[in-house]
């Protein structure tokens, strides 16, 4: 959801428990995808989880459904070894949207062009899969 007003600590703090659980889910996805491939260590990605959760769920003007919006904030991670955290975050957020749409039928939980644009948890099985 786009953040329209400047976020305040008081407004954001009511969600901190949800953010912690979201971070735990992202951490688990990172561990699973890297362990499946016996690839690298998760330290770089896992250290970025709290930052990404807090910025993308409240501090930034960013919408996972429409990241191309003209006034949306952008985030950039320079280190390539941090790619797993972005993949895991997108998988968790998109699964949450899918579940909410399934529960409510509300079209606002759909991602436009979802099949082509959404990274889903099944995609994590192919991280660093060469052949």
PLM regions: where:
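Conserved N-terminal diphosphate/IPP-binding helix and adjacent helical/loop segment
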Residues: 16-30, 41
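Non-catalytic, mobile gating and regulatory segments of ester bond hydrolases
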Residues: 1-20
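Cofactor-binding active-site loop characterized by glycine-rich and histidine/acidic residues
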Residues: 11, 30-36, 46-131
């Amino acid at each position: 959801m786009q953040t329209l007003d400047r976020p305040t600590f008081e407004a954001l703090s009511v969600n901190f428990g949800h953010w912690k659980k979201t971070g735990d889910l992202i951490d688990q996805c990172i561990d699973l995808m890297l362990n499946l491939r016996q690839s690298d260590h998760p330290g770089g990605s896992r250290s970025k989880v709290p930052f990404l959760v807090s910025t993308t769920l409240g501090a930034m003007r960013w919408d996972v459904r429409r990241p191309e919006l003209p006034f949306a904030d952008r985030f950039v991670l320079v280190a390539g070894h941090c790619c797993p955290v972005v993949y895991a975050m997108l998988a968790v957020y998109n699964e949450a949207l899918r579940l909410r749409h399934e529960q409510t039928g509300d079209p606002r939980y759909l991602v436009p062009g979802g099949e082509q644009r959404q990274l889903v948890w099944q995609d994590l099985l192919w991280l660093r899969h060469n052949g």
